[in-house]
UniProtKB/Swiss-Prot annotation:
InterPro entries noted in UniProt: 6-blade_b-propeller_TolB-like, PD40, Tol-Pal_TolB, TolB_N
DNA repair as UniProt keyword: no
Protein localization: Periplasm
Subunit structure of this chain's protein: The Tol-Pal system is composed of five core proteins: the inner membrane proteins TolA, TolQ and TolR, the periplasmic protein TolB and the outer membrane protein Pal. They form a network linking the inner and outer membranes and the peptidoglycan layer.
Signal peptide span: 1-19
Protein keywords: Cell cycle, Cell division, Periplasm, Signal
Gene name, Swiss-Prot/TrEMBL: tolB
Bilayer-crossing regions: none
UniProt protein name: Tol-Pal system protein TolB
Source organism phylogeny: Bacteria, Pseudomonadati, Pseudomonadota, Alphaproteobacteria, Hyphomicrobiales
Purpose: Part of the Tol-Pal system, which plays a role in outer membrane invagination during cell division and is important for maintaining outer membrane integrity.
Keyword Signal attributed: yes
Species this protein is from: Rhizobium etli (strain ATCC 51251 / DSM 11541 / JCM 21823 / NBRC 15573 / CFN 42)
Biological processes per GO annotation: cell division; protein import
């Protein structure tokens, strides 16, 4: 289980103590425009943080986060000329320019008298000879990886001007066993595949987990007692409850942006329609009313519109409607069928799964259906989910002849596709908002 106390234990001092101790020059030169499409990764040197093994481990996670983004190219430490012995002092900038390190990260990790870890870092513009930013954090020792992710986010934001996505978690379906006796459990992990924990025991089939905006709840579909139902799971306590005891099958749940409602598909009399349920009053509202299968609803980030999948035209396509169910409009018109639409946190794009020509592809289009782009194609790619900054997607892939699915990430350029390593097969990922 994800303990809320662990999240609250992390005290972010940056902006208060950090602002006084670590200055940021207004004329720092290093920047990375990530809106230009395919860019050259920025060479960056991430030194081992002082003191000891923990400092080296923190810097390794930071470098791995930055490299995995595809926007940074951490320089091999064997090329370093200067050995940082005092992260408070200005480095020898000429030594770092020689190895083309356009940015430099230094820092230290120490243990306080009360047992907490204190982690601090400085980001330097080597060619301008200036410090760009610096922050410090306090946390319990078991949260050291979170500190590393937060520092990586701070570096990402300072250089790109946009929020990072490293201090996040992913909930997914962990799959083990043979195809004939497949065990599926809800699981949660850090976005880089570490700190995996199972949330259910695998006795029932589970599908489509989704985070609440508060990050403290997950909604998902379960076949407990042979009855397909939508459930709410409290991550702190492990307590779960059914979202409405409907006579028909409920599936494809997702929270509204304000966390007050769950939108889902309810099957009755052979067809499925989109409903919302107010989580306080438990009242339901029907949004679609067709003889087709309407499913996979997803809110726009402002909560004003909903994208969904419907086969009312003969095969699955993507539709958009207002949050009250009015103005239902088809937006996908390419070859093949479209499914699993999910709105970007930025509101500018909708990601989807497309089946055409014997392949399953992950793509994006604008909310009006224009600008369709396929990011990756293969034997079976499905279930895109957005990083909270709207720059990266995660999905699951079943390769031809493989024993089970695996998770992959890819950026909006269609480049930097990477395997997200998990202890077992994995499917149905859902990315959390940034942690607090």
């Amino acid at each position: 289980m994800v303990k809320c106390s662990l999240i609250r234990a992390l005290m972010v001092v940056a902006g208060l103590v950090g602002a006084a101790a670590f200055t940021t020059p207004a004329n720092a030169l290093v920047e990375l425009n990530i809106n230009k499409g395919n860019i050259q990764p920025l060479p960056i040197a991430v030194t081992d943080f002082l003191q000891g093994d923990m400092g080296a481990q923190v810097s390794q996670v930071i470098a791995a986060d930055l490299q995995r983004s595809g926007l940074f190219a951490p320089i091999n430490k064997t090329a370093f000329i200067e050995k940082i012995s005092n992260p408070d002092a200005a480095p020898r900038f000429e030594d770092w320019k020689v190895i083309n390190a356009q940015a430099l990260v230094t820092g230290r990790v120490t243990q306080e008298a009360d047992g907490r870890l204190r982690a601090e870092f400085r980001l330097w513009d080597t060619f301008a000879g200036q410090q760009m930013t610096g922050q410090q954090f306090y946390t319990q020792p078991e949260n050291w990886r979170r500190v590393a992710h937060i520092i990586a986010d701070a570096i990402y934001k300072q250089i790109t001007g946009e929020e990072g996505y490293f201090d996040t978690r992913v909930v997914f379906v962990s799959e083990s066993g043979t195809k004939q006796q497949r065990k599926r459990q809800l699981a949660i992990m850090d976005q880089d595949g570490f700190n995996v924990r199972t949330l259910t025991d695998g006795s029932d089939l589970v599908l489509t987990p989704r985070f609440s905006p508060s990050r403290q709840e997950v909604t998902y579909m379960s076949f407990a007692n042979q009855q397909p139902r939508v459930y709410l799971l409290q991550l702190e306590t492990g307590q779960r409850e059914v979202v409405g005891n409907f006579p028909g099958m409920t599936f494809s749940p997702r929270f509204s942006p304000d966390g007050q409602k769950v939108i889902m598909s309810l099957q009755q009399e052979g067809n499925s329609n989109i409903y919302t349920m107010d989580l306080r009053s438990r009242t339901t509202t029907r949004l679609t009313s067709t003889a087709a299968i309407d499913t996979s609803p997803s809110y726009s980030p402002d909560g004003a519109r909903v994208s969904f999948e419907s086969d009312r035209g003969g095969k699955p396509q993507i539709y958009v409607m207002n949050a009250d169910g009015s103005g239902q409009t088809r937006i996908s018109f390419g070859d093949g069928s479209y499914s699993t639409p999910v709105w970007s946190p930025r509101g500018d794009l909708i990601a989807f799964t497309k089946q055409s020509g014997g392949k399953f592809s992950i793509g994006v289009m604008k909310p009006d259906g224009s600008g369709e782009r396929i990011l990756t194609s293969g034997f079976h790619n499905e279930g895109p989910t957005w990083a909270p900054n709207g720059r990266v997607l995660m999905f699951f892939r079943q390769a031809a002849g493989a024993g089970g699915p695996q998770l992959y990430s890819i950026d909006l350029t269609g480049y930097n596709e990477q395997l997200v390593k998990t202890p077992s097969y994995a499917s149905d990922p859902a990315w959390s908002p940034l942690l607090e």
